[in-house]
C-alpha cells in the first residue's frame, strides 16, 4: 500500500486510531452490576453522548441521567437526556446543563450509583462559574487561554479554580453515593484531573497555582475572577476529602491505545512503526521542526530505523497566536513540518485531532506530501507567510489536502504520522 498510495495508508492509520477509542470498544468491560438503589448517569465531553448510548445498550437495570456534548455530537438515547452546548468557547446552554447536573447529584444515598462519562471537551461544556464570575467572564478567559500558548494542564488548572462544578465538586455533590468514573483521555499524561478539568476527581493544585499561570501568560482577569482566586474561595476538592472516598476511576481509552492500534495497521502494510510518544507538548511549529529532523535522519541515514517506517506520536501541542488566519495546532504542526522538510522525497504525513475538530474549524487536520510546497507556490501561496499568519487550514484547504471526518464521537487528542519510504 505504501508504494501505491501513501495517502491511503496515512488515512487508514488515522482511522484506526479513532476507531480504537470508540466507546463501543471500551465501555462494556468496565460496567459493574446494578446497585441496590438508583443508577444516575452524568457526563460531559465530545465522546460522552456516544458513551451514554453504549451504556444504555449494555446496562441491565434502570437508569436515568443527563449528559452534555458539543453541538453536532448528540446521538439518540432512550433513558439518558443528551444536551448540546458550545465548544471550545462555552455558552449558556452548557451553563444550564451544568447547573442541572449538579442539582441531579443532590440527595443521593449510599445505595445509589453515579456513572460519570467524562471525555475531552468537558471543560467548555460544563461552564458553571464560581462565585462572582459571570459566563461572559469565563468566555473571555477561555478565549485568552486558547490564544496564549498555555498547555492544556495549565488552562484546566485555571478553569477548575473559577468553576462551581469542576475540580472534584461534582463528585463531592454526589456523596454518599458510589461514583464510577469512566474517562476517555484527551490530555498528555492521562491525568484524570485534567480530563474535562476533573469534575469528579480530587485536585491537588491551588488558587495560587492558577494565579501563577495567569501571570505567566499575561491573562487579563476580570475583577470577579481575580477576587475569587486571590481570596482562596475558588479552592477545589483536595485528595483525601472524605466525600470522594466512594469514587472509582477508570481510563477506558487513551492516546497510547490509539497509537498502538495505528501501529498494528502499519505492520500489516509492511511498514515499521516507531512510537515517539503519546504525550508530546510544546509549540506546534517547534514540534514540527523536530519531527522533520527525525524524518530526515531516517531518510538519509536509516536511523533510528530504516525505511519504510512511520513515526507515530500523540499529545497536545500549543499555538501562540500571532496572526489572524484560520489555524489549529495540527495544521500548524504539519505546515511547519512541510516547510522544514522542504520537499524531501519519499516523506508524507498526516496530523489531525481525533475528535474531528482542529482549532475552531470543523476540519480534523490535513495531509502533507513531498510536493506540498511546490503546489502551494504554483498557486501563489507563500508557505512561510501562511505559517506566520497561523493560517494552516487556509493553506491546506487551498491545496485540497484537508482531513475532514465530521464528528468522530470520541477524543483521544492529536494523532500524527510521518511515513518515510
Regions found by a protein language model. Give the residues of each.
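Glycine-rich, mobile lid/loop segments that gate access to catalytic sites or pores
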Residues: 106-194, 199-202, 388-391, 395, ...
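A glycine- and small-aliphatic-rich helix-loop capping segment at beta-alpha/alpha-beta transitions
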Residues: 54-63, 79-81, 106, 129-140, ...
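Accessory alpha-helical/coil subdomains and C-terminal extensions
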Residues: 177-180, 202-292
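An N-terminal, well-structured beta->alpha segment
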Residues: 1-42, 50-51
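Active-site segments that bind and position negatively charged phosphate/pyrophosphate groups
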Residues: 270-351
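Gly/Ser/Thr-rich active-site loops/lids in small-molecule metabolic enzymes
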Residues: 133-150, 203-218, 323-349
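Internal helix-turn-beta structural module
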Residues: 334-421
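Glycine-rich oxoanion-binding loops at beta->alpha junctions
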Residues: 68-110, 158-159
Amino acid at each position: 500500500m505504501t508504494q501505491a498510495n501513501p495517502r491511503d495508508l496515512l488515512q487508514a492509520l488515522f482511522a484506526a486510531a479513532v476507531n480504537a477509542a470508540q466507546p463501543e470498544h471500551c465501555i462494556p468491560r468496565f460496567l459493574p452490576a446494578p446497585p441496590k438503589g438508583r443508577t444516575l448517569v452524568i457526563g460531559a465531553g465530545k465522546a460522552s453522548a456516544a458513551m451514554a448510548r453504549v451504556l444504555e445498550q449494555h446496562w441491565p437495570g434502570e437508569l436515568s441521567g443527563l449528559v452534555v456534548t458539543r453541538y453536532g455530537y448528540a446521538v439518540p438515547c432512550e433513558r439518558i437526556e443528551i444536551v448540546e452546548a458550545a465548544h471550545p468557547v462555552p455558552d449558556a446552554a452548557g451553563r444550564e446543563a451544568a447547573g442541572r447536573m449538579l442539582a441531579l447529584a443532590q440527595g443521593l444515598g449510599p445505595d445509589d450509583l453515579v456513572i460519570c462519562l467524562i471525555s475531552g471537551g468537558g471543560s467548555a461544556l460544563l461552564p458553571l462559574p464560581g462565585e462572582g464570575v459571570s459566563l461572559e467572564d469565563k468566555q473571555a478567559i477561555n478565549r485568552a487561554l486558547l490564544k496564549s500558548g498555555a498547555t492544556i494542564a495549565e488552562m484546566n488548572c485555571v478553569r477548575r479554580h473559577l468553576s462551581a462544578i469542576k475540580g472534584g465538586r461534582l463528585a463531592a455533590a454526589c456523596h454518599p453515593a458510589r461514583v464510577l468514573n469512566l474517562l476517555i483521555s484527551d490530555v498528555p499524561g492521562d491525568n484524570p484531573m485534567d480530563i474535562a478539568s476533573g469534575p469528579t476527581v480530587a485536585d491537588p493544585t491551588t488558587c495560587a497555582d492558577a494565579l501563577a499561570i495567569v501571570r505567566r501568560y499575561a491573562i487579563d482577569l476580570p475583577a470577579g475572577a481575580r477576587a475569587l482566586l486571590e481570596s482562596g474561595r475558588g479552592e477545589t476538592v483536595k485528595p483525601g476529602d472524605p466525600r470522594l472516598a466512594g469514587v472509582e476511576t477508570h481510563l477506558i481509552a487513551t492516546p497510547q491505545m490509539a497509537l498502538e492500534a495505528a501501529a498494528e495497521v502499519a505492520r500489516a502494510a509492511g511498514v515499521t512503526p516507531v512510537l515517539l510518544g503519546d504525550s508530546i507538548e510544546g509549540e506546534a511549529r517547534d514540534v514540527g521542526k523536530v519531527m522533520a529532523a527525525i524524518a530526515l535522519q531516517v531518510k538519509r541515514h536509516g536511523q533510528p530505523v530504516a525505511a519504510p517506517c512511520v513515526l507515530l506520536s500523540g499529545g497536545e501541542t500549543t499555538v501562540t497566536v500571532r496572526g489572524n488566519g484560520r489555524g489549529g495546532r495540527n495544521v500548524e504542526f504539519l505546515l511547519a513540518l512541510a516547510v522544514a522538510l522542504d520537499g524531501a522525497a519519499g516523506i508524507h504525513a498526516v496530523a489531525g485531532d481525533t475528535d474531528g475538530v482542529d482549532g475552531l474549524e470543523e476540519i480534523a487536520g490535513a495531509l502533507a506530501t513531498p510536493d506540498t510546497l511546490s503546489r502551494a507556490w504554483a498557486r501563489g501561496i507563500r508557505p512561510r507567510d501562511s505559517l506566520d499568519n497561523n493560517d494552516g487550514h487556509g493553506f491546506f484547504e487551498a491545496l485540497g489536502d484537508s482531513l475532514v471526518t465530521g464528528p468522530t464521537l470520541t477524543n483521544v487528542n492529536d494523532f500524527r504520522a510521518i511515513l518515510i519510504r
